[in-house]
From Swiss-Prot:
Residues 89-226 form the GST C-terminal domain. It catalyses: RX + glutathione = an S-substituted glutathione + a halide anion + H(+). This is Glutathione S-transferase T2. It comes from Arabidopsis thaliana. May be involved in the conjugation of reduced glutathione to a wide number of exogenous and endogenous hydrophobic electrophiles and have a detoxification role against certain herbicides. Transmembrane segments: none annotated. The keyword Transferase applies. It is found in: Peroxisome. The keyword Transferase applies.
């Protein structure tokens, strides 16, 4: 049964468990338990974790909560986990446990308490608490100092002096990553005095890429939302006493007048995707996935494939004057486009199927948009992406416009005797694009898919030929029998030839049956000979074993006689009680 992980990516322990599973290629289903909607308090979830907290896992019959316990279990239960995460060395494991226990009582109260009471509380329906934030900041500062002076002392790259991260590194770094939701200046104020901690965070992030950035993307989006709220509050209530500025300046510092400029620079680095950007990304994906000279089919790794796409997007002439996007950003945007467009394709198919007489194409679009909103409670905003992808096999409509005009019929026309039917998604049934007609583009098969297809075709052809040959022989026999029964006439030249053919066919069948019988008889004879040889071998082995046992018994008897002879040769009083007992016992056995 597949592992189930119940998590909310806004939760630090949840992010640690998700990154660990992804890095170690553990197959799992991620089930969202929204903390904002209080889903962790539902009766259904409390059957899994009575504490009402995330993360929790279900692995077969096992239900487990607490992130540290989950990480230890996954490290021990799954063979794909590399040893450096939770080494077999018991002394190293003990040190990891000491770090994890310290984490719960020091770093976690400091980091979580500060972020909650200075930024996140309003999002959870709670008031901000500057006093609690100041207390948490003191705990956080002391914890960072302890990390740098004790756990990261010397030139250690990771905790405990290892060259690779452990579950302790992952758990603590995910804890500190929640500081990303703070204002940039506030976050740097807390971390910049601790250079070793910053290097350690970056080393752990690189060791878990690209999964670390993917899972922490929710923090980056939250940071953007909080920054917009700060800007709106600053614009509506300017002045040094602004409440929003106070939240980001707990501890005696102030954002100052450079807050807006800093936010503008950060937004320039993380600019939004525009429709032209989406079109370039889609073109890059289609070209990279369909070009037989470039694609390495199923043998290429995912990051190599996306690096090609990222290079294609960065080299686009229309984006020459803009900051380059990373390949993992392109992958995240593509996943969103693919998800939304696939959902809209289903709604568009449903609208085409329901198309009534007299409805125009615009009417169908309106119905599709309404179906999308009814199903997913949001508007479809990627029509430009759908229009780029609609002519490809994966995203094309399953209903043709011609059939839809006739009342939504989905009947297909047989094109040839090979069992091929017309369909809007069948490349063979789509005509060549003439006078602006649209043509569905098909993705080329990969190496393995092509070989499998050729093998299936060859096997199918061979089976069809055998069946056709068998049917032909049966039909010939049936015709001969029917003619003989119906036409009870004197044999002429034609009847003689038919009778000769029938006799020859029956003779051939009898010869085949006789050959099969002889073959089976020969196999039985060989089997009987084999059984006789095995029985003879067993008999010889049994005889040898009996002789061996007899020889062993004779050796034992001779040994006892030698011992008795030695004891009898001694004078009275020279033997001990045990030797006298042994001598009497041997004499009794001999008699």
């Amino acid at each position: 049964m597949k592992l189930k992980v119940y998590a909310d990516r806004m939760s630090q322990p949840s992010r640690a468990v998700l990154i660990f599973c992804k890095v170690n290629e553990i197959q799992f289903d991620e089930i969202l338990i929204s903390l904002g909607k209080r889903q962790q308090l539902s009766p259904e979830f409390k059957e899994i974790n009575p504490m009402g907290k995330v993360p929790a896992i279900v692995d077969g019959r096992l239900k487990l909560f607490e992130s540290h316990a989950i990480l230890i279990y996954l490290s021990s239960a799954y063979a794909s986990v590399v040893d450096h995460w939770y080494p077999n060395d018991l002394s190293k494991r003990a040190k990891i446990h000491s770090v994890l226990d310290w984490h719960h009582t020091n770093l976690r109260p400091g980091a979580s308490g500060y972020v909650l009471n200075s930024v996140l509380a309003p999002a959870l329906g709670l008031p901000l608490n500057p006093k609690a934030a100041a207390e948490a900041e003191n705990i956080l500062t002391n914890s960072l100092s302890t990390l740098e002076t004790f756990w990261l002392k010397g030139s250690a790259k990771f905790l405990l002096g290892g060259k690779q991260p452990s579950i302790a590194d992952l758990s603590l770094v995910c804890e500190l990553m929640q500081l990303q939701v703070l204002d940039d200046k506030d976050r740097l104020r807390l971390l910049s005095p601790h250079k070793k901690v910053e290097q350690w965070i970056e080393s752990t992030r690189k060791a878990t890429m690209p999964h670390s950035d993917e899972v922490h993307e929710v923090l980056f989006r939250a940071k953007d939302r909080f920054q917009k709220q700060r800007e709106m509050a600053t614009a509506s209530k300017p002045g040094p006493q602004s409440k929003i500025i106070q939240f980001s300046s707990i501890g005696g510092t102030s954002d100052g007048p450079n807050l807006v400029q800093d936010t503008t620079d950060r937004k320039a680095r993380r600019r939004k995707w525009s429709p032209p950007d989406d079109v370039i990304l889609i073109s890059a994906w289609l070209n990279t996935s369909k070009d037989r000279k470039v694609v390495v089919y199923d043998e290429q790794q995912a990051h190599t494939f996306w690096k090609r796409i990222g290079a294609h997007v960065s080299n686009s002439a229309s984006l020459a004057n803009l900051p380059k996007r990373e390949w993992n950003h392109c992958r995240q945007r593509w996943r969103k486009i693919n998800d939304y467009v696939c959902k809209f394709v289903g709604c568009y198919d449903q609208a085409l199927n329901q198309r009534a007489s007299g409805q125009s194409e615009d009417d169908v679009f309106q119905v599709a948009y309404q179906l999308y909103y009814n199903n997913y409670m949001s508007n479809f905003k990627l029509e430009h992406a759908w229009r780029e992808l609609r002519h490809n096999k994966k995203w094309c409509s399953t209903y043709t416009s011609e059939n839809s005009k006739g009342g939504g019929s989905s009947k297909r026309t047989k094109l040839n005797g090979g069992g091929v039917y017309s369909s809007s998604c069948n490349p063979e049934s789509v005509p060549i694009a003439l006078d602006g007609e649209e043509q569905v583009m098909d993705r080329p098969l990969g190496v393995k898919s092509s070989k499998q297809k050729e093998k299936k075709v060859a096997t199918k052809t061979m089976l069809e030929e055998r069946e056709a040959d068998s049917r032909s022989r049966l039909e010939n026999l049936w015709v001969l029998d029917e003619e003989e029964q119906v036409m009870d006439l004197p044999l002429g030249v034609k009847s003689s030839k038919q009778k000769e053919r029938k006799v020859a066919t029956k003779t051939m069948i009898e010869e085949r049956e006789a050959a099969n019988f002889r073959s089976r008889l020969g196999n039985l004879w060989l089997l009987k000979e084999k059984e006789e040889r095995e029985a003879d071998s067993r008999s010889r082995l049994e005889n040898l074993w009996a002789l061996k046992e007899k020889d062993i018994e004779e050796q034992k008897k001779l040994t006892r006689m030698e011992v008795l002879k030695s004891l009898l040769g001694r004078r009275t009083g020279e033997t001990s009680e045990k030797e006298e007992t042994l001598k009497n016992k041997l004499i009794d056995e001999m008699l």
